[in-house]
Amino acid sequence: MTDDTAAPPPRGPARDWKSSPLVSGLLLGLFSLVSALMLALASDATRGPIAARSAEDLLASLAQVLPETLHDNDPTADIRTLSDADEGAVRVYVAARGGAVTAVTFELTGYGYGGAIRVLMAVAADGTILGARVLSHTETPGLGDKIEIGKDDWIEGFAGRSLTDPGPAGWKVRRDGGVFDQFSGATITPRAVVGTIHRGLTLFDRHRAELLAPLPPRS
C-alpha cells in the first residue's frame, strides 16, 4: 500500500532564463545591432562637416598657387584624371576662361628624409609654374620643415620656372650641380621637393594636349 502523502522527489535547481545560451545570444546580437546603428548615425552626422571642411581646405590650397584672374570657372568642378605610366592616376583641377584652359593644378608625392611629402603645383598653359605648396610632410622640425611656406619662402622660388628654365641639368639642388638652394643640415628634403616638382612638369609635358583640350560648353 502506497502512502499518497509521501513528499514528491526533489527537483533540480530552478534555471534562470537569463543564463540561457539562446537568450545570451539574442542579447548579444541586439547589443551589436544597436551599436552598429549608433555608429552609422554618428558617421552620417559627421560626414557632411568633414566633406565641407575638405572642400574648404582644397579651395584654400588652390588659391595659394592659382591666381583667380586666370579662370572664370570652378576648378574643383572641372576635373580631369590622367592615367600616366609613371605617376599612375593623377587628379587634375582645370582652370579656364571662356572654356579655354589657362592652367592646371595637381598633387604629386615625393619622399624626403622623414617620409612622404605631398606637393600641390599649378602649371600655366605655356608650361611655366604658377606656384607650388607643400600640403603635408613629416620632415625634421627646424631643418626640413623650411619647405613650408609658413616657415620659409624657399618654395616660392619655383614660380616662373619650366622644363627649359633652368633646363634638365639645373633641376637639382646646388650641392648636386643644380640651381636650387638646399638647407643647412638638410639636403634630402629640398632635393625631394625639387625632384617632385620637376616630375610634375614632365607629367604636364607628356599630357599637354589632353590637359589643354577646351572644356565642353556648359548646358
Swiss-Prot record:
Enzyme class: translocase
FMN phosphoryl threonine carried by residues: T187
GO cellular component: plasma membrane; plasma membrane-derived chromatophore membrane
One Pfam family matching this protein: FMN_bind
Keyword Flavoprotein: yes
Cofactor: FMN
Molecular function terms, GO-annotated: electron transfer activity; FMN binding
Residue intervals passing through the bilayer: 25-45
Alphabetical UniProt keywords: Electron transport, Flavoprotein, FMN, Membrane, Nitrogen fixation, Phosphoprotein, Translocase, Transmembrane, Transmembrane helix, Transport
InterPro entries per UniProt: FMN-bd (IPR007329), Ion_transpt_RnfG/RsxG (IPR010209)
Main location: membrane
Family: Belongs to the RnfG family.
HAMAP family cross-referenced by the UniProt entry: RsxG_RnfG
Protein name as it appears in the record: Ion-translocating oxidoreductase complex subunit G
Species: Cereibacter sphaeroides (strain ATCC 17023 / DSM 158 / JCM 6121 / CCUG 31486 / LMG 2827 / NBRC 12203 / NCIMB 8253 / ATH 2.4.1.) (Rhodobacter sphaeroides)
Gene designation: rnfG
